[in-house]
Amino acid sequence: MNWFKENNIFDNKLAKKPAASKLGASPTASRPAGSPAPRRVKPLNKSELAHAAIVKRIGRGSDRLNEISASFVPPEYGFRFDEVPACSHKLEYACERDLREHFLSDNEREAMKSLLRFATNYVLGYINSKDMLTFGRAAGLKLKNELEYVQESECTMCGYKFKDNTRVWMLYVIVRHPPRAASADEEFVPSPNTPDCFEFACCDCADNYPDQLNSHQVYPGINSLHAQRLVEAGFFYQYVFPLEYKTEYFTYNDVKIVHHEGPFKIIQRLLREYKRPNEHIVSITLRTTGGVVLKEINHNVRLMRYRNIYKEPTASDDVNCFTVSSSSELMKALDSGAFDSIQGTVFAEIYGFAIQEFVTGVITFPVRPVKGNYCAVCKKNKMYYSNPVLCCSKCGFTNRYIFNGKYDDLYFHPEAVQTHATHSTHGEFVRYYNLKLHAKICRERLEEYEAQNLQ
């Protein structure tokens, strides 16, 4: 299956987005309507209802008693915005602003958003499997109307129960690297598929951990550099399949802009017309015949639970928002009016890298295995007939470590995820990966690829 991954033939439709050779007139971008905070006279939405039910079930401590976090906006406050669309997160949003959040690939954005959602629940004291399905790429899968599997969360280093709600609302992921081999001739190749490689740590344990370079904050925010390191370490999976991070660098030279409408419109249109979903932009350089006039570099993008963690947000745009703290050459050019005198042709250079594999499934995380976490349907070996069980509504997501890397080389196809409804009293669902359907999809994609090459 490695040949399929290297050639990326399965994601042909996404990868073949045509790149424009010349920037023409852009469609008029209208300013979307604002997204004010929903008033509390309205009924609670699904996320708030689920949180309230889980808090009651696990007995979470009151926020009012957590004095150390009194100055922070509570993690659960943002749930009220889950059904309110945000405006500024979209590339086409008309307001002039820093566009570097859109330099990230869709893979990175999906991974960061999934991790922040998971971390938000984790800090609140639980892991909500239905929430992971709802906010992941699980379209078409049947869900129970009520809660599915819920697991209490804890610091895997000291055992602190986050539901106790007595420590600061922060969460870290620590990557434990195995010790070096005793002899240089006997190099040890670390495997990410072992339960002790990752720790979900409270702030106290993370602060005292000696290897700070491998300690990554994931709540109240996560930055893109840490997300990349976690991907490389094997932290992110799609169900029980690794999310790989193989990259290939590229440069688009001398993209010609004959009639420009200022630096913001130029970069916005370059991102819209040249950047593919699986591409990460490192820098965009604009120049004239006289030399470079602007170079926007993507240093580090951060995804925050709240734009200001000390002030309650009033709009959905300030919840789960991407921010960039480093200075922006684009914003400097807008403030100074540097492009006002440039009337001729502007040339653009785009430098970045493409990620070969796309995020097409629900992203899961290396939670420690729970002993006896199986039922009569998903069984101890987590197999539905000859197919691996991915998620059970009663027992949650199948722990990646159960299969001991057996399916690590399979290229994940979302079409092969299927649901079996049990006949139990509570109407449980088992989601499994149909290996026969997987093989059929592989054959069809390969035949399609070969046919295209013969033309």
Curated annotation (Swiss-Prot):
Q: Where is this region: Disordered?
A: 20-42
Q: Where are the zinc fingers (C4-type)?
A: 374-394
Keyword DNA-binding set for record? yes
Q: Which Pfam families match?
A: Baculo_ME53 (PF06061)
Q: Return the InterPro entries for the record.
A: Baculo_ME53
Question: One MF term in GO for this entry?
Answer: DNA binding
Highest taxon listed in the record's lineage: Viruses
Q: Which residues form a coiled coil?
A: none
Q: Where is the signal peptide?
A: none
Which keywords belong to this entry?
DNA-binding, Early protein, Metal-binding, Zinc, Zinc-finger
| Protein name in the entry | Early 53 kDa protein
Q: Which organism is it from?
A: Orgyia pseudotsugata multicapsid polyhedrosis virus (OpMNPV)
